[in-house]
């Protein structure tokens, strides 16, 4: 398919223009045309780029791309190494950050909720990026944490008593521990995100709302993989999801 056609389709599907983001969404590095093979991954790391080159991908589609607000604009060091490989092999790089968190079916939050068996009931936070939902049956924090560990193949950080009853879940993938306060105000029993900060522990203890830190990378694998599968089905392109392990 044509590179411009893909970019326009993704921008429209993910409603990229409506988000005030920390980075440019869409095509970040131009490569060859046409595009027949797309590799997806969470972050445009050098390891992902090299893996995509090895399988002869025409484009890479990620959640974490480049050119973040406030970063050093010089093309040196790590940035040089990554861009050098993309440009030398004429590989396109597409990146969608907040738009890929928010999509109602393909987004990170939608995919994580489905993976954990949560029925969505509402949203909260800026651009309604935070999600609220309920479990089919009330359970305990310990039992729910076991489900999280099994589905994400990673032991989560759990703040709260294992026997605490939970039914209403708030969640936002990635580094959204800063939205814990908003989740508490929304009346959830437990809030789940990817990371935790020092103050997260105190808020959990003092609010009575449990917290689960399930991994920034682990909670954000679903969206880009689902989006790649959608593109393969819609356009008939080849799609390969490559997971570069990350313990954070």
From Swiss-Prot:
Molecular function in Gene Ontology: metal ion binding
UniProt keyword Metal-binding present: yes
GO cellular component term, pick one: cytoplasm
Entries under InterPro entries matching the protein: DUF34/NIF3, DUF34/NIF3_sf
Residues binding a divalent metal cation 1, per UniProt: 63, 101, 220
Family listed: Belongs to the GTP cyclohydrolase I type 2/NIF3 family.
NCBIfam families: YbgI_SA1388
Oligomeric form and interacting partners: Homohexamer.
Name of this chain's protein: GTP cyclohydrolase 1 type 2 homolog
Organism whose genome encodes this protein: Ralstonia nicotianae (strain ATCC BAA-1114 / GMI1000)
